[in-house]
Amino acid sequence: MTFIYNKIMKLGAAGLLAAGVLAGCASTESKMAVPYIVELKADNQVNPNASGKPSPVKVTVYELKSTNAFDTADYFALMKDPRAVLGDQMLEVNSRIIKPGSTEEIKASGSTQAKALGIVASYRDLNNSQWRLVVELPEAETTNFYKFWQFSPDEKRIRIDVQRAAVNVNKTEPK
């Protein structure tokens, strides 16, 4: 009887130890952000000046929780003080100056709260350009219960064409 009791106690202790180790490996987050790269490709004839010559253009990318404030924001207010205009809807902001015919990348780890990117191109002729674009981001991925089984989400590539007087999403795909 003592032999069986000792065996049960050892198995029980081993089971509790294993459960404790596995619980220690459990992820506390239920979602993981999807990392992404924004590829900004400028057209050869982008942002023409008064004489029609292509010129560099500044492109600003906002990582957003919601697009409500961005959709209605004035260009000049966004450029002057984006935090005042977008408030807590803005998570991150990155800018690049792109030369005609060139490509720039913005790499981001993403955020579980991010829902979209707001993209603004600072064209010379704002009144005759489509300077604002919203691109939906992939949803944060649900994590596994045990962290050691968890793989990082695949990085997504978001291609944005910065055309003569408009910004357009080309496509979103895994890298």
Segments predicted by a language model, with ranges:
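A short, solvent-exposed beta-strand micro-motif common in secreted/extracellular proteins
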Residues: 115-125
